[in-house]
């Protein structure tokens, strides 16, 4: 099933505009859709007690690029309690470019929002001053409207840049307004800047390519072992499917 034919392209899914912007912009850069195994590309399921079963939908969509992108994938979830857009671009390691990471989660009582250029090397080895200044300016503008969430632990923070947008919002009308307007604007600005940098980058030497490969492996292994979405996914789809999804699709190239 094409993701365009699913609920995730419809206005009643919280993150539909974000997903459409992703897919449309990646297609402009001649990215090619990657075939996802059918058991992960679309799944309908139920969760909850026998007396109050709820429906949940999951779709996984991915693309590659012949030179620039190893794998870019979106995982979308829709249910009465949870609505998730998780997106990651894994760049080719012949370019010194960070990951592009998105994690927008609607929980029963709140929203968790993360948007960043996530480093695969130390910040000083991957971000020049011009990029850092641009990111921090965009971040500060976003957080002039969206509250900044609590400080991340050092173990988690090492996988984020100084430009990370990180917010928690209550489920209320004001939050819907902020997501529809400020967050969507910031999301477009971040993605546009990222794709511009990725597609203008020059190839790096073999030694740096090895460092980038090791850095990506380190990040993906950490995410695979410590994915904070694991409990939610397990409650919706069961442990066996969740572990298979994490291992085979979410954090692999």
From Swiss-Prot:
It catalyses: (3Z)-phycoerythrobilin + oxidized 2[4Fe-4S]-[ferredoxin] = 15,16-dihydrobiliverdin + reduced 2[4Fe-4S]-[ferredoxin] + 2 H(+). GO terms for biological process: phytochromobilin biosynthetic process. NCBIfam families: PRK13248.1. The keyword Oxidoreductase applies. This is Phycoerythrobilin:ferredoxin oxidoreductase. It comes from the Bacteria. Keywords: Oxidoreductase. It is an enzyme of class 1 (oxidoreductase). InterPro entries: Ferredoxin-dep_bilin_Rdtase, Phycoerythrobilin_Fdx_Rdtase. It holds the Pfam family Fe_bilin_red. Its EC number is 1.3.7.3. GO terms for molecular function: cobalt ion binding; phycoerythrobilin:ferredoxin oxidoreductase activity. Belongs to the HY2 family. Catalyzes the two-electron reduction of the C2 and C3(1) diene system of 15,16-dihydrobiliverdin.
């Amino acid at each position: 099933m094409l993701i365009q034919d699913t609920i995730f392209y419809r206005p009643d899914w919280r993150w539909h505009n974000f997903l459409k912007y992703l897919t449309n912009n990646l297609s402009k850069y001649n990215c090619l859709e990657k075939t996802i195994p059918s058991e992960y590309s679309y799944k309908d399921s139920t969760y909850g007690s026998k007396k109050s079963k709820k429906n949940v939908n999951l779709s996984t969509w991915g693309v590659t690029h012949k030179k620039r992108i190893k794998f870019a994938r979106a995982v979308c979830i829709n249910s009465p309690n949870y609505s998730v857009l998780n997106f990651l671009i894994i760049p080719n390691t012949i370019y010194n470019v960070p990951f592009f990471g998105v994690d927008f989660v609607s929980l029963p009582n709140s929203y968790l929002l993360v948007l960043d250029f996530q480093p695969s090397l130390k910040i000083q080895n991957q971000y020049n001053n011009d990029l850092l200044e641009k990111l921090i300016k965009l971040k500060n503008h976003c957080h002039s409207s969206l509250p900044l969430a609590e400080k991340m632990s050092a173990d988690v923070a090492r996988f984020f840049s100084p430009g990370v947008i990180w917010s928690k919002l209550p489920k209320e009308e004001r939050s819907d307004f902020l997501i529809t307007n400020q967050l969507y604007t910031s999301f477009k600005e971040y993605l546009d800047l990222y794709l511009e940098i990725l597609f203008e980058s020059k190839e790096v030497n073999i030694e740096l390519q090895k460092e980038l490969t090791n850095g990506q492996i380190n990040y993906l292994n950490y995410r695979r072992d410590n994915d904070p979405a694991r409990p939610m996914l397990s409650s919706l789809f069961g442990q066996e499917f969740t572990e298979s999804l994490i291992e085979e699709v979410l954090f692999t190239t």
